[in-house]
């Protein structure tokens, strides 16, 4: 047969403790070792999710390791982490962009919305630290009363 190597970086694992733990792809340490300064780490805390607040399950964190706009790993500690990691497994398996995850529409209010918000958090610093955006905002502020 032909030599082949199975791709396994998109296979998630979960530990059903309290809180649940889940991981797919590279951990932060592995991503930092492989990608160095190209790595961005995005964090989103459950305490900013309305469903988590309503259910009093606000202890939790999702962390996504991103290189050049694409996730290379995700770690989740919190309520339903084993369910939430599925989206990131799909993202890694299909090499999806963070913009595609951020553009997804989730029912409101759901815990699953933390995935979308984590993806959206990737763009915050990019947008507000951009010199181009700063120049445009400065121009608009001078023109508008």
Task: Enumerate the predicted regions with their spans.
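Glycine-/small-residue-rich beta-strand-loop submotif within the FAD-binding core of flavoenzymes
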Residues: 1
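Flexible, glycine-rich terminal cap/loop adjacent to redox cofactors
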Residues: 4, 11, 16-27, 32-145
